[in-house]
């Protein structure tokens, strides 16, 4: 029982560290995407242990992972298209209003 609460707290601390990295590193798109994936991983750990603690089925965690993979693929496709058009992944090197 105490081990389960330790995992809850660990996943929340992981999420907070991911949020801090996301807020502090805003220059590169790749570091932003990595911090978002770290936050998603900590949410998955929290969700998995919560569903096991409440004796629910863990099918929802599979749906969550499916959508997380889709989010990661979309982020990587934006990164690749940005590197092809601008040559780097700096946010300061291009205008957001430009099509």
From Swiss-Prot:
One of its GO terms (biological process) is ATP synthesis coupled electron transport. It is found in: Mitochondrion membrane. InterPro entries: NADH_UbQ_OxRdtase_chain4L/K, NUOK/Mnh_C1-like. The keyword Nucleotide-binding does not apply. Keywords: Electron transport, Membrane, Mitochondrion, NAD, Respiratory chain, Translocase, Transmembrane, Transmembrane helix, Transport, Ubiquinone. Coiled coil: none annotated. GO terms for molecular function: NADH dehydrogenase (ubiquinone) activity. It catalyses: a ubiquinone + NADH + 5 H(+)(in) = a ubiquinol + NAD(+) + 4 H(+)(out). It is a multi-pass membrane protein. The chain crosses the membrane at residues 4-24, 29-49, 63-83. Belongs to the complex I subunit 4L family. Core subunit of the mitochondrial membrane respiratory chain NADH dehydrogenase (Complex I) that is believed to belong to the minimal assembly required for catalysis. Complex I functions in the transfer of electrons from NADH to the respiratory chain. The immediate electron acceptor for the enzyme is believed to be ubiquinone. This is NADH-ubiquinone oxidoreductase chain 4L.
